[in-house]
């Protein structure tokens, strides 16, 4: 235990919910590391409401217990991190699947200036039976690959439970998630925030519990995937939306001049209606991606930028949105008025329904796109007012 005059360098934080079977050995390994290495540190057990006496076991083995009433993996860890007194924090599960006596690689990288040091179980070795095949061959590799692609992260194992970080750097990220997706949030926000990130090989042993783990494969896997997608508007909204918008718009315009025949397949009014709907959905998705990215960048998240987007952001405003939207709306309205006078010229009699509907769909589409653009410009104006006030 550090004396009252010693500055604590390392806090080893373990989330805990009924870990009486394995908690003692985890704490002993952590204490052994601190004693052997000479690192001035502490062991913190962030207890999430254990009813099996885990708190008493932790105190008996020299750990500091922090009661965290808010349930969840992320909640427990943030409670422990907030209470930590060390410059650095190493966090890991209290189920004896990670070896807390071998933390030298993490501490070395942290002392070298890295702000997040991730363990990589696939490089260090996974003991037989330590990880379900679904997680080993599908869940972890696929989700980690998605994370690397979406956020250009160098991390190969997004969900390793053993990781170290500079405490203040992580607190500055303002982490929010309370469940298992906390593991992904740390990596994603560290990457977007420009933190110095690295990884070291680590091992994963079969945990020592006789009960099932807290992890729920499909539920928690979905939470990880959902978080990754929400923080990547480019892949979730922009690219799919742009594809839908251009396909729908081109199809709508072509059919407005007459049916399209491809072999034995004909595309006419009914196809045009669906293509117009696809255009509207795609356009809304693109607008949402742009607004989301602008908001995220104003909030300090370092989402990868591009020159084209920077130029677009400078040109987008309430006024420009209103002008472009009004122009689209008026063009659509003009087509509708022209169609009305054409009908009047026929004495308000019967018209070719196919040709009439094709023109009406195009006019309605332009009016809807115009209205959406005006509303997006107004929302951006409100957003900018709110951001300026926050500053």
Model-derived regions: residue spans:
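N-proximal low-complexity "stem/linker" segments adjacent to membrane-targeting elements
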Residues: 1-32, 39
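Hydrophobic helical membrane-anchoring modules
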Residues: 1-6, 152, 175-391
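Short beta-strand/loop segment that forms part of the nucleotide-sugar
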Residues: 27, 31, 38-49, 66, ...
């Amino acid at each position: 235990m550090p004396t009252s005059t010693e500055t604590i360098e390392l806090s080893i934080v373990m989330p805990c919910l009924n870990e009486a079977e394995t908690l003692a050995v985890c704490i002993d390994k952590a204490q052994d590391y601190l004693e052997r290495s000479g690192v001035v540190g502490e062991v913190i057990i962030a207890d999430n409401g254990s009813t099996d006496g885990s708190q008493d076991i932790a105190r008996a083995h020299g750990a500091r217990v922090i009661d965290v009433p808010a349930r969840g993996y992320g909640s427990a860890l943030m409670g422990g991190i907030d209470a930590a007194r060390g410059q650095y924090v190493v966090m890991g599960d209290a189920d004896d699947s990670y070896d807390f006596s071998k933390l030298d690689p993490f501490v070395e990288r942290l002392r070298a200036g890295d702000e997040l040091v991730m363990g990589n179980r696939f490089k260090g070795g996974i003991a037989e039976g330590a990880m379900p095949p679904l997680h080993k061959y599908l869940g972890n590799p696929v989700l980690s690959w998605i994370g690397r692609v979406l956020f250009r992260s160098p991390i190969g194992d997004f969900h390793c439970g053993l990781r170290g970080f500079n405490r203040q750097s992580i607190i500055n990220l303002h982490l929010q998630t309370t469940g298992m997706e906390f593991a992904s949030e740390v990596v994603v926000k560290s990457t977007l925030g420009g933190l110095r990130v690295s990884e070291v090989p680590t091992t994963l042993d079969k945990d020592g519990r006789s009960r099932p783990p807290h992890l729920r494969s499909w539920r928690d896997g979905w939470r990880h995937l959902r978080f990754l997608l929400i923080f990547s508007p480019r892949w979730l909204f922009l690219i799919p939306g742009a594809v839908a918008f251009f396909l729908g718009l081109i199809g709508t315009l072509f059919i407005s001049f007459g049916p399209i025949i491809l072999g034995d397949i004909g595309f006419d009014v009914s196809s045009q209606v669906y293509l117009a709907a696809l255009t509207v959905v795609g356009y809304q998705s693109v607008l949402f991606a742009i607004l989301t990215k602008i908001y995220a960048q104003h909030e300090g998240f370092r989402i990868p930028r591009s020159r084209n987007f920077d130029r677009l952001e400078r040109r987008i405003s309430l006024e420009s949105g209103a002008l472009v939207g009004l122009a689209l709306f008026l063009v659509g309205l003009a087509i509708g008025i022209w169609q009305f006078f054409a009908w009047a010229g026929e004495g308000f009699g019967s018209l070719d329904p196919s040709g009439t509907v094709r023109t009406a769909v195009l006019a309605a589409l332009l009016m809807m796109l115009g209205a959406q653009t005006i509303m997006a410009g107004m929302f951006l104006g409100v957003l900018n007012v709110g951001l300026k006030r926050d500053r």
